[in-house]
Amino acid sequence: MKKLTSAIIISSLLSFNALAETLPNVTILGTGGTIAGSAAKSTDVTGYKAGEIAVTTLIEAVPQIVDVANVDGIQVANTSSSNINSEILLGMAKTANELLAKDTDGIVITHGTDTTEETAFFMDLVNQSDKPIVVVGAMRPATAISADGPMNLLNAVTLAASEEANGRGTMVILNDKIGAAYYISKTSSISMDTFKAYDQGFLGTFAGGAPKFYFEPAKVTGKPSFDVSKLETLPKVDIIYSYQDMGPEMIDALIESGSKGIVVAGSGNGSVPKAVRDKISELNESGYPVVLSSRTGSGFVTAKEHAIGSGDLNPQKARIMLMLALTETKDLNDIAGYFGTQS
């Protein structure tokens, strides 16, 4: 009987090892956010503290993950996504690229939803591999009765482990919907269905526990790629919100504080009051980069005589693009090329 039991155990271990060898390898980079949030009450979905739970604990809470991929976790940070900075982004990019250059088949980043689109867009521009990077979050903390994080995480790992995800760039997955990092944005402060790409739509959805893509892999038209492996810092770039009666004083203050470039969230197609336009024209003539985006949330901002148009990038993504562009050039026309809006 003992011999039979031992044989069964050995057989089970061999089967498990064989399965592990055939599964894809996925590394989860934990940064905190609501998905790792904790509240005093299970009914509290707003008064919680983000970035309280370790990434290893998040993985352990979803035992089905082991059927999808060989998973390990790295705690990059554990904070609210509003605290994610250039130092964290650069470190995460270097880690992801080093892993993807080896035997890691996909990367998952757990992240707070408030700035998910910025991190995802950054990773999309700096990924040096065709292997997928998937950014995932949650709208309810891990302690909530109906927390969305566990299913979102399982979907994210499944997506990162899928061969069909190769060549699609960085993606964002929440609420069963797969979005391209280049276009996806958070559109509601409370809705579970918060991420949208108004003009471009989604890449796919989850059905029956598997990703279903609407299109074959395709590259965003004109999307640049940046190698950040040797960078230790990123240029300081700030955003100003346009409004009636706005003056140029904030622009002057930002330049004095050390900003190397400015993105203006203008009204409509990047419109700003005359006093601000005159200031931007003056800066443009001096070679200082100002990018005009739109506060509308969607649409295209065309090339301007007095400034760089952001194309189809919203202000927060235009800031990421300008930061990375400035690591390669100071020429305004070359910078405009990264936005696809050369004059």
Named regions from a protein language model:
Residues 1-20:
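Gram-negative bacterial Sec-dependent N-terminal signal peptides
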Residues 21-97, 249, 278:
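ATP/NTP phosphate-donor binding region
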Residues 23, 29, 54-57, 61-65, ...:
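Accessory alpha-helical/coil subdomains and C-terminal extensions
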Residues 29-31, 109-111, 134-137, 171-175, ...:
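Short beta-strand segments
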Residues 101-116, 257-269:
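Short acidic, glycine-rich surface-loop motifs adjacent to enzyme active sites
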Residues 110-131, 272-281:
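Short Gly/Thr/Asp-enriched flexible loops that form oxyanion-binding sites at enzyme active sites
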Residues 135-207:
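Internal gly/pro-rich beta-alpha loop/helix module
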